[in-house]
Amino acid sequence: MKSVTLKLVIVLALVGAFAAQTATAQQHPPAKELLLWQKLDTFVQSENRNLDGVLGVTILDLSNQYTLLLNADEVFPTASTIKIAILAELYRQAQQGKLKLTDTYTLQQSDLVGGSGICNALTPGVTKLTLRDVAALMISVSDNSATNILIDRVGQENVNALLDSLNLTHTRLRRKMKDIKAAAAGRENVATPRELTQFLEALYRGKVLNKQFTDDYFILLSTPKSSYIPRELPEDLKIANKPGELEGVRNDCGLVFNGSRPYIICAMSTYVRQERAAGDAIARISGETYRMFDRLSRSSPYGRVVSPRDTSAP
């Protein structure tokens, strides 16, 4: 499969027709850098062929907008990855003065649902948490009870309004966590790899929150967690990500703060027969992506390494 260079973006690894991009000027990556992108393209395509399921990937270089796309506009179940949008709406309402992250909430018996998390081990009627604490549980251990508390607090319709304001029309919060009846009726939380990437990029570029809330948003999203993107990456590298898992579904989407070459990677899979294989594929794609960006961030235009590994935020 060939690759093409479009306006301000290099688009690789698409199944079928290439997606059109609009911009005002033409920009091409240096020839040797293009070869690295092509090698990454080949790697991603190989993982896609070997996976017994459907895989979608978007990789965005935040320093120059070069992008790799595989099934990037296919709609996938988000599982817990949708929680990055719930978190953003919480922070947006805090910025607007509609709530404070330090507001407290008393855990109720009716809040408790199954699945991942630790709220079920806490004492209802007694346990008090700040809204930021509730958000931390939602992100760090993917607590479904905590997530539903926040959905009630910020409003499902407001999460979708935020997505609409960014023209993300395929990314939807349609139900609470563990609402099996809603899922069976087809009200699934969904997104595309491209739109989740665009969502994180909008946050990174300050288009959703001011600097104070943007910084804290990514601090919370960078909480270490069991996930796929960091598995093959250095432990001291800042990674703001949120995985998601359902039966037949494995996802992970995040921003890797790789010094002068930060990037976003979003990988989603569905119709997966072997979930472990899908998670392993996402981890390998993430590892190969990091190794390319690490070389680019530390090398001269000729490829000679001229600086040590940089894990600082740009």
Each language-model region and where it sits:
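Structured C-terminal helix/loop/strand segments within mature extracytoplasmic catalytic/sensor domains
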Residues: Q26-N50, R153, Q198-S227, P234, ...
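Mid-domain, small-residue-enriched loop/turn segments at the edges of structured enzyme/sensor domains
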Residues: V54, T127, N148-L200, Y204-R205
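Bacterial N-terminal signal peptides that target proteins for export
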Residues: M1-I10
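Active-site SXXK
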Residues: Q65, F76-Y105, I265
